[in-house]
């Protein structure tokens, strides 16, 4: 998976945390059997910046821990003009699944509040956002069970246990 990580924090995110994000998302991509040419980005920021994004795009006037913006393929306008290509060429074109924004302030706050490691909380949030990019949600109780179990399975298999 082609993963771009952008650090927009003021103090800079330690390399070991950037590497953890890279590793856990690569692991999650393999766990879900995504194509090797799948693309996505993660932007690391502070509470102030994620608050602004949350307010602008979701209409919620507060900071949050993680926001995902999936790039969806069900665009009706695009469906009116189908692109026809052979399977070999189609396999070479990367699929961008979207972008994740993570508040590093919230990672620290929530790890402290929940009593687990900073690394566990960071892994939890990026996998949570990653699953949203891949069509999972928790709006309905049954969907929540599926998503949260998959999230726990990925984190446990990777080694980020509670």
From Swiss-Prot:
GO process annotations (BP): rRNA processing
InterPro entries linked: MetalPrtase_cat_dom_sf_prd, YbeY, YbeY_CS
Protein keywords: Cytoplasm, Endonuclease, Hydrolase, Metal-binding, Nuclease, Ribosome biogenesis, rRNA processing, Zinc
Family as reported in the entry's similarity comment: Belongs to the endoribonuclease YbeY family.
EC number: 3.1.-.-
Annotated Pfam families: YbeY (PF02130)
Gene3D superfamilies named among the record's database cross-references: Metalloproteases ('zincins'), catalytic domain
Protein name, as recorded: Endoribonuclease YbeY
Major localisation: cytoplasm
GO molecular function: metalloendopeptidase activity; RNA endonuclease activity; zinc ion binding
Gene this chain is encoded by: ybeY
Keyword Transit peptide carried by entry: no
Claim: NAD is one of the keywords in the record: no
Subcellular location: Cytoplasm
Chain sites annotated for binding Zn(2+): 128, 132, 138
A GO cellular component annotation in the UniProt record: cytoplasm
HAMAP family named in the record: Endoribonucl_YbeY
Role summary: Single strand-specific metallo-endoribonuclease involved in late-stage 70S ribosome quality control and in maturation of the 3' terminus of the 16S rRNA.
UniProt remark on cofactor binding: Binds 1 zinc ion.
Species, as recorded: Levilactobacillus brevis (strain ATCC 367 / BCRC 12310 / CIP 105137 / JCM 1170 / LMG 11437 / NCIMB 947 / NCTC 947)
Required cofactor names: Zn(2+)
């Amino acid at each position: 998976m082609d993963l771009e990580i952008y650090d927009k924090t003021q103090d800079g995110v330690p390399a070991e945390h950037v590497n953890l994000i890279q590793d856990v998302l690569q692991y999650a991509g393999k766990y879900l059997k995504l194509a090797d040419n799948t693309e996505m980005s993660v932007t690391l920021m502070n509470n102030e910046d994620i608050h602004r994004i949350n307010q602008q795009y979701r209409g919620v006037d507060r900071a949050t821990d993680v926001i995902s913006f999936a790039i969806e393929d069900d665009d009706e306008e695009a469906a009116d003009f189908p692109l026809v290509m052979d399977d070999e060429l189609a396999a070479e074109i990367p699929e961008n699944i979207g972008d994740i924004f993570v508040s590093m302030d919230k990672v620290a706050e929530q790890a402290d509040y929940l009593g687990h490691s900073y690394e566990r909380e960071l892994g939890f949030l990026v996998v949570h956002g990653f699953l949203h990019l891949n069509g999972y949600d928790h709006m309905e109780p049954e969907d929540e069970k599926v998503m949260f179990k998959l999230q726990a399975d990925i984190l446990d298999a990777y080694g980020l246990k509670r």
